[in-house]
């Protein structure tokens, strides 16, 4: 069904994806571009991997932060398209607080890519979801790191954020915008009832889950004891047989 949709909605992207088997066989890249246009964020999460690049809780004043310019984005889009790449993910920070977000999407050119945006869901209501769909965004990847409001809000250091994600999931579905969850997994979490409860929740909501391994960078730079090992990796593979999750 997704292929049929892509073929009619974004034929250029479909054509590039259909060429992936040949590219793989010939050793060419089919890389997904995960693109951090700006590090602006309205959260101060416990595990933030880019916390050294912005001023927590003062993002409006962080004028000296690193960022791309729109002309850089146009050049990147052109080069990626010429390489036959087909997937583009706008990440951050929190992409939906970028003031020139619409211009950013236009600079990427949605007709050339299957376009995904990350979001913590705080600003994503139905009207916003409809707008994202209208300007060419194909999928939203919502961050959710707990099966309960208490777990998620504590991890994200943002009271009320779990409820905002719940709203965002429904908003995307109502706007016919593809949606998946993104969650961080670390050594201790995979052994908890909370982890299975989280996966059961995603299954009930009929949304897939992208599982991100915690890494010893940013705010987790010195939290090496919580990194996944081969043992936990094998346990995660067992969960993959039961739930719609991928890494």
Positions of PLM-derived features:
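Radical SAM enzyme [4Fe-4S]-AdoMet core and its adjacent flexible, acidic
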Residues: 135, 143-145, 150, 154-247
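Conserved alpha-helical substructure of the radical SAM core
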Residues: 2-139
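C-terminal accessory regions of radical SAM enzymes
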Residues: 1-24, 200-204, 234-247
């Amino acid at each position: 069904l997704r292929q049929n949709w892509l073929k009619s909605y974004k034929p250029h992207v479909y054509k590039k994806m259909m060429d992936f088997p040949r590219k793989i066989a010939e050793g060419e890249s089919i890389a997904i571009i995960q693109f951090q246009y700006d590090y602006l964020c309205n959260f101060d999460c416990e595990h933030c991997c880019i916390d050294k690049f912005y001023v927590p809780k003062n993002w409006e004043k962080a004028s000296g932060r690193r960022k791309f310019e729109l002309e850089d984005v146009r050049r990147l889009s052109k080069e990626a398209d010429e390489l036959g790449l087909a997937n583009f993910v706008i990440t951050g920070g929190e992409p939906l607080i970028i003031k020139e977000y619409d211009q950013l999407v236009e600079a990427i050119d949605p007709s050339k890519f299957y376009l995904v945006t990350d979001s913590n869901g705080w600003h994503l209501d139905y009207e916003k979801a409809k707008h994202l769909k209208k300007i060419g965004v194909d999928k939203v990847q919502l961050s959710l790191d707990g099966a309960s409001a208490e777990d998620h809000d504590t991890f994200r250091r943002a009271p009320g954020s779990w409820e905002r994600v719940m709203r965002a999931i429904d908003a995307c579905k109502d706007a016919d915008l593809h949606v998946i969850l993104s969650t961080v997994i670390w050594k201790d979490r995979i052994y908890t009832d909370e982890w299975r409860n989280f996966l059961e929740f995603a299954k009930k909501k009929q949304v897939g889950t992208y599982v991100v391994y915690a890494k010893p960078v940013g705010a987790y730079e010195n939290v090496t004891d919580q990194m996944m090992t081969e043992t936990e990796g094998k346990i995660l593979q067992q969960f993959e047989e039961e739930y719609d999750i991928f890494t």
